[in-house]
From Swiss-Prot:
GO terms for biological process: amino acid transport. It is a multi-pass membrane protein. This is Amino acid transporter AVT6B. It comes from the Eukaryota. The chain crosses the membrane at residues 37-57, 58-78, 118-138, 164-184, 191-211, 236-256, 273-293, 328-348, 365-385, 388-408, 423-443. The keyword Transmembrane helix applies. Belongs to the amino acid/polyamine transporter 2 family. Amino acid/auxin permease (AAAP) (TC 2.A.18.6) subfamily. It holds the Pfam family Aa_trans. One of its GO terms (cellular component) is organelle membrane.
């Protein structure tokens, strides 16, 4: 039984063979000699930059620029430390997956806890992505008020730009093809485009900010938080979950490492991706807050529904919204990849790897089933977002901080230093505190929503 567990450990996440050796490309044709450094960086950066980027300018409004930017940078360093813990104990325990590390430290129970956390977190994230894409392209009804989508604004109301049809076409033409790749490296080009689209949003925001600065002038941004009473003090902590979850990418690190031409370069890959993402985060937060000031909404994308007061403002609004929707479409398959592997690990713990040719039927069935569940959840279960706000917050901090810290504190191989254990304790305290705030904030917002008096 122990041998069986060891075999399955290598399958839990990204079970591609060690790619220093040439292997046939699973997706048809050619030899695969390992992923490039740049492709690995783009895939990891795309895993990091998701929907949360739009909430960062609002954190600057609450914290002020100096503490806000400082915390964004500090969280990048803390994420690097948590990933380094996993990679180091992977090498020590001769494991090639996050699940393998958890299995090595906590046995089968630890591995299953990780798989369930990734299942809950990633299904929730992907459903939210699909909901956001539907909101941007097809519009939504909220509190009895209809918010027109981009397609409706361009072409008027028609059967083909209604929400369900738009998401069905997006699923069949974008999500289905991109989720059919067996190697994450096959997504390197779409990941590069995804990062470029995030930069497009940043460039447009920066450009508008500079134009407004020289034409109308901008208010002086708040450098430090404005704490006037106990309520404003507690409000500072509401941004903690956004910042803590900003860099969660741990479930794809081993998959990317296993496919690298030189797996020993995974640490530079991680640090390059974190440096790139933290730069995008800081610049987006800075320019977004400078542009909208105290009018910055919790989701800055909503600010681009208003008149910007500059020439071609409506065109720029549409460019921002479309680039964001397209960005999420290309993030989708990168987040879907570890979800499929971990679902397979839960349901078929002793089956051959999904990358093998004998697993084609299982691969296709799991892929189709997951896409169907995500599509149905985004379209036909209105309250599903509320549910995943609670479960997703808990699962994400477990994946990013609690599990890596627990591996260090368990220290099965007696390799952790006192400094490692101190950092691990700080991670757990931060994660638990962040999760408690997130659950309280979500519960309070949900209570307010259900007590809202809808207009007649």
């Amino acid at each position: 039984m122990e041998n069986l567990d060891e075999i399955r450990t290598d399958i839990v996440e990204s079970t591609a063979p060690l790619l220093q050796e040439s292997s046939s490309e699973s997706n048809g044709g050619g030899e695969f000699n390992g992923a490039s450094f740049s492709g690995a960086v783009f895939n990891l950066a795309t895993t990091i930059i998701g929907a949360g980027i739009m909430a960062l300018p609002a954190t600057m409004k609450i914290l002020g620029l100096i503490p806000g930017i400082t915390i964004i940078v500090l969280m990048a360093f803390l994420t690097d430390a948590s990933i380094e813990f996993l990679l180091r104990f992977s090498n020590i325990g001769n494991q090639r997956s996050y699940g393998g590390v958890m299995d090595d430290s906590f046995g089968k129970c630890g591995r299953i806890m990780l798989q369930v956390s990734i299942l809950v977190s990633n299904i929730g994230v992907l459903i939210v992505y699909m909901i956001i894409i539907g909101d941007v392209l097809a519009g939504k009804n909220e509190y009895g008020i209809h918010h027109a989508g981009m397609l409706e604004g361009w072409f008027g109301i028609s059967w083909w730009n209604r929400r369900t049809f738009v998401l069905l076409v997006t699923t069949l033409t974008v999500f289905a093809p991109l989720t059919c790749f067996k190697r994450i490296d096959s997504l390197r080009f779409t990941s590069a485009i995804s990062v470029a689209l995030a930069v497009v949003f940043l460039v447009i925001t920066a450009g508008i900010t500079i134009i407004k600065l020289f034409t109308d002038g901008l208010m002086m941004p708040r450098l430090l938080p404005n704490v006037t009473d106990l309520s404003s003090f507690w409000k500072l902590f509401t941004v903690v979950p956004v910042l803590v979850n900003a860099y969660i990418c741990h479930y794809n690190v081993h998959s990317i490492q296993n496919e690298l031409e030189d797996p020993s370069r995974i640490k530079p890959v991680v640090r390059s991706a974190l440096a790139m993402c933290s730069s995008v985060y800081v610049m987006t937060s800075l320019f977004g807050y400078l542009l909208f000031g105290d009018g910055t909404l919790d989701d800055v994308l909503a600010n681009f529904d208003t008149d910007l007061g500059i020439p071609f403002g409506s065109v720029l609004n549409d460019a921002v919204r479309f680039s964001y929707a397209a960005h999420l479409m290309l993030v989708f398959p990168v987040v879907f990849y570890p979800l499929r592997i971990n679902i397979d690990g839960l349901i078929f713990p002793t089956a051959p790897p999904l990358t093998s040719s004998e697993s084609d039927l299982r691969f296709g069935s799991i892929t189709a089933g997951l896409i169907a569940v995500i599509f149905l959840g985004a379209n036909f279960i209105p309250s599903i977002w509320d549910a995943f706000q609670f479960t997703g917050a808990t699962a994400a901090v477990c994946i990013g901080f609690i599990f890596p810290a627990a591996v260090i504190l368990k220290d099965r191989h007696n390799q952790a230093t006192k400094r490692d254990k101190t950092i691990a304790i700080c991670m757990i305290v931060l994660a638990v505190f962040s999760n408690a705030i997130a659950i309280y904030s979500d519960a309070y917002a949900l209570f307010k929503k259900h007590t809202y008096v809808y207009p007649i």
